Amino acid sequence: MPKILVDADACPVKAEIKQVAEQFQLDVIFVASFNHYSVNTNGENWIFVDTGKESADMRMMNLANKGDIIVTQDIGLASILLAKGTYVFSNRGELYREEEMSLMLDIRYRHAKERQQGKYSKGPKAMSDQDRVLFKDRMTTFFKNK
């Protein structure tokens, strides 16, 4: 049975993920750095890793199996996990596709270069209640069609 792995450090839709997981009786594993440690995990399955730059990513790569569902905003991690045969959602409910990754990684690279040159672009807009509903609807539809 597939599981849901969540890149939890900055994930704004943890509550929505838990609701969908309960609806479809799926296990959820939240992976976060010790910087986000809490004793209040409410019976959830949390794995805390070192605060190193790629520690959470490495742990998620090791935990992920073909058919698992991943939630991350990290395009680099998404591209690696897609190659493992997982399904990867963004925090906004977009289902990443392997054929899009090359372009997305190129855009990420160009934006990083622009930031190095002192050009700053706006970050993503804040999550609204409507965004949260959309995420939950998209994930629910995915599982209903699976």
Curated annotation (Swiss-Prot):
InterPro entries: UPF0178. Transmembrane segments: none annotated. Belongs to the UPF0178 family. This is UPF0178 protein Lin1493. It comes from Listeria innocua serovar 6a (strain ATCC BAA-680 / CLIP 11262).
